[in-house]
């Protein structure tokens, strides 16, 4: 029995960051649900990484915003998030998962904030956007999704890159440039770049392929979501995958054969 418990604990320990974060999200959501919508709205206002809070130097919002969500019931999307983070932790180990999530969450937040500030200064956006709430885990999750690019087998990597970049850009365009969709595109690119520095991933197994399927579906719902259609980004994704894969194949065919 002790041997079995030790083996189970060892397996659980391999995804400890994922489990800790999921438990923290669930706990915060439960407490806010108990305290009521008024308190929930007030907490969102205080931890939001909008221009108002960042402009006042509330740097702590860069951390706190990742633990508070404004979207539907947590049980709807938490399983997908757990699958995505668990896969990242199994492929890259705990430390690199934390780095990927932090780069996606904090990096995309700051880049989007800088873009919004520049657009307001240029008169392209109304100043009312400075108070729009911006909380949740989506930037960090998409950053982790981006790192999978470096772990995907080489023969499928070009199609993977083309699909996700086209989905992200397509969703941003369809949404009319809404800053959250733009942030997802930024987080995705940051994750792809960070993944190139992670070295060799752990080997793929049937379990990890299964997690990838769930993570990809969840990632599409996050990245491709907009108020108009979920199909438009998918169309862009298919086109992007075909174009990038075709281009990569053409380049590969034109490479000169090695001299023996």
How would you label these PLM feature ranges?
Residues 26-31, 105-114, 163-177, 212-226:
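Aromatic-anchored segments of alpha-helical transmembrane domains
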Residues 96-128:
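Hydrophobic alpha-helical transmembrane segments of integral membrane proteins
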Residues 33-94, 116, 126-127:
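N-terminal TM1-TM2 helical hairpin plus the immediately adjacent luminal interfacial "cap"
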Residues 128-148, 179-189:
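Membrane-interface micro-motifs in multi-pass membrane enzymes
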Residues 61, 79-86, 141-147, 163-173, ...:
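Hydrophobic, membrane-inserted alpha-helices
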Residues 2-45:
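N-terminal signal-anchor transmembrane alpha helix
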Residues 1-10, 173-260:
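C-terminal transmembrane module of polytopic alpha-helical membrane proteins
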Residues 83-101, 148-155:
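Membrane-interface helix/loop boundary segments of multi-pass membrane proteins
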């Amino acid at each position: 029995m002790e041997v079995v418990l030790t083996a189970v604990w060892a397996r659980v320990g391999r995804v400890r960051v994922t489990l800790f974060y999921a438990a923290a999200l669930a706990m915060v959501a439960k407490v806010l649900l108990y305290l009521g919508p008024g308190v929930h709205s007030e907490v969102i206002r205080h931890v939001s990484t909008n221009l108002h809070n960042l402009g006042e130097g509330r740097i702590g919002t860069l951390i706190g915003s990742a633990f508070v969500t404004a979207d539907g019931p947590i049980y709807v999307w938490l399983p997908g998030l757990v699958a995505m983070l668990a896969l990242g932790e199994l492929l890259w180990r705990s430390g690199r998962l934390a780095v990927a999530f932090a780069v996606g969450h904090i990096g995309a937040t700051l880049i989007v904030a800088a873009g919004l500030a520049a657009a307001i200064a240029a008169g392209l956006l109304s100043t009312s956007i400075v108070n729009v709430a911006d909380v949740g885990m989506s930037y960090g999750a998409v950053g982790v999704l981006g790192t999978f690019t470096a772990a995907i087998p080489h023969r499928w990597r070009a199609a993977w890159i083309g699909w996700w970049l086209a989905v992200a850009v397509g969703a941003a365009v369809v949404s009319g440039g809404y800053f959250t969709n733009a942030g997802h595109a930024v987080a995705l690119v940051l994750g792809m770049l960070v993944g190139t520095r992670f070295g060799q991933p752990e080997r793929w197994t049937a379990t990890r392929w299964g997690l990838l399927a769930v993570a990809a579906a969840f990632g599409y719902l996050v990245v491709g979501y907009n108020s108009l259609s979920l199909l438009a980004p998918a169309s862009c994704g298919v086109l992007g995958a075909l174009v990038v894969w075709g281009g990569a194949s053409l380049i590969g065919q034109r490479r000169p054969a090695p001299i023996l």
